Each structure stands twice: as C-alpha cells, then as structure tokens.
Amino acid sequence: YYQTRLHMCHVSTRGAIEAIQMAKLRGAPVTCEVTPHHLWFTNDTCDYRVNPPIRTADDVQALIDAIRSGVVDAIATDHAPHSAEEKARPLTRAPSGMVGLETSLAVTLTALYHTGKMELTEIVRRMTVNPASILGLSKGRLALGNDADIVIFDPNEEWTVDPEQFASK
C-alpha cells in the first residue's frame, strides 16, 4: 500500500462511494468528485448517454449523503458537448457526454440547495475552494495573490435551459 495521491473523477455509484470512504478511513490520500447531472437525474427519469451512465435513485442518494458527510470532496462538471449531428447517431455510434459548464451551478442548486439538502456556502465550497485545493491552484477563494475569479448569482433566480443560448455546443 503506497501513499500515492489518487483523485477519483465522476464517481456515480454507492459502491464507489463505499470504497472511497473505506480508503479515507484507512488514511489513504484519496479525493473524489461527483458531477451535477449524477446528483439530479436517475436512470428511470431520463435516457441521456453519458459516461459514467446516469444511475439509480439509490446511487443518487448515496452521492448526496457522501457530499453531506464529507466523503465527496468536490462537485465538478463533466463538460462534454457534442454536435446535434453526433448525438443523433444510433446509440452505439453516438459519443457520450452532455453540456455541463453552463448548467452545473443551476443543476447543483436544484438538486441540493432548493431541496434543503445542503447550505449554499457548502455548495460553493465544493464547486470552488475544494477543487482548487485538490489541484493546487491559487483559485477558489478571494485572497491576496489568488486569481480574482468571481461569480455573482441569485440562487433563487429561475431560468429555462435553452441550448440555443449556450456558448459551448
């Protein structure tokens, strides 16, 4: 057993969460992230082709519980847009992925904040401070010497997702 850092991307199942939790309890330097779409969609409510696939309601609940308990360190987009022509191909020939960059905050707020499952400050931490810390970047917080990246938003503003308005397609 080596003390090598490991970051698990796009964790999406209860089993993966359990394995990560066990590794952390043993002191392994493991971090992980989940995607907003794996916190909101379930395989019985949508038929999106993403990798890893959209999972069961039980898996979604396990991810949410793991975020709340601190097992999950970050919430990060799996931004993988494809053209309409690519996505219209038969399932076995279509690339997996979905636009995530422009919807990640809204989906996360819908799944966690507006359902009362997580405070806004914790969501912001998991989407900014923690990812920057994991990657060793001078970002994610307003501090002397850090990049002054800032987003101002109204967590209660409602809007309709319109793919025609996306900057990334």
What are the residue ranges of the model-derived segments?
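Glycine/Thr-rich phosphate-binding loops of Rossmann-like dinucleotide-binding domains
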Residues: 16-17, 40, 83-85, 160-161
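Short, surface-exposed loop/helix-turn segments at secondary-structure junctions
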Residues: 48, 91-92, 160-169
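Histidine/acidic residue-rich metal-binding segments in metalloenzymes
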Residues: 1-75
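Catalytic metal-binding/acid-base residues of hydrolase active sites
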Residues: 12, 35, 80-82, 158
